[in-house]
Regions:
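Serine-dependent carboxylesterase/thioesterase catalytic core
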Residues: 4-19, 23, 27-119
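C-terminal catalytic-base region of ester-bond hydrolases, centering on the histidine
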Residues: 110-183
Length: 183
């Protein structure tokens, strides 16, 4: 079942801002999604930024009668995970790109569909640190051939993001790599 195009908020990695996610946001907007940038300047982790992000998220989520999807690159993916922990009823799904989700100890599993897109060629975040516990319901790890700095412009990453966003969370199935995409 294909769901209607819903709201998506895209979060950049550490030290980056909205300019770094323009390719992702443009691709999703061209598919009919209502895409929201993070709108908080450069991602420099501070308590003030965490508070501002939570406010920004609530501002975006309250515009819709349904939960919004979160797409986070690197540290932005960790933020997306934390937002979904804090307000799961407002989050439709979480998609992370090369995000440091574990340091030997997994983050708590989310109640929403969670896809970690990772690459063994990342070179910034160890691919093993990007993995979610895929034994949990509606959690998966999808490997791509990319580097950390090109995850946001890699066509194979966009294939995964688009596929995951199209899925009805109640009819979730693991991503199936198209034959020509490879891993």
């Amino acid at each position: 079942m294909v769901v209607k195009r819903s709201g998506v908020m895209v979060l950049p990695g550490m030290g980056a801002g909205d300019a770094s996610t323009i390719a992702i946001r443009t691709a999703l907007a061209s598919q009919g999604y209502r895409v929201h940038r993070w709108n908080l300047g450069r991602n420099v982790p501070t308590p003030e930024l965490q508070s501002a992000l939570r406010s920004r998220f609530f501002d975006v989520a309250e515009r819709y009668d349904e939960p919004v999807a979160l797409v986070g690159w690197s540290l932005g993916g960790l933020y997306a995970h934390r937002l979904a922990e804090f307000a799961p009823n407002m989050v439709r799904s979480v998609i992370t790109l090369g995000s440091p989700l574990n340091d030997g100890k997994q983050l708590p599993s989310l109640s929403v569909p969670t896809t970690s897109i990772y690459s063994r060629n990342d070179r910034v975040v160890s691919w093993a640190r990007s993995l979610v516990d895929d034994r949990q319901p509606r959690h998966e790890n999808v490997e791509v051939r990319s580097t950390h700095l090109t995850l946001g412009i890699d066509p194979s990453v966009m294939v995964v993001i688009s596929d995951r966003l199209r899925r009805d969370p109640d009819r979730w199935k693991p991503f199936r790599t198209p034959p020509l995409m490879g891993a």
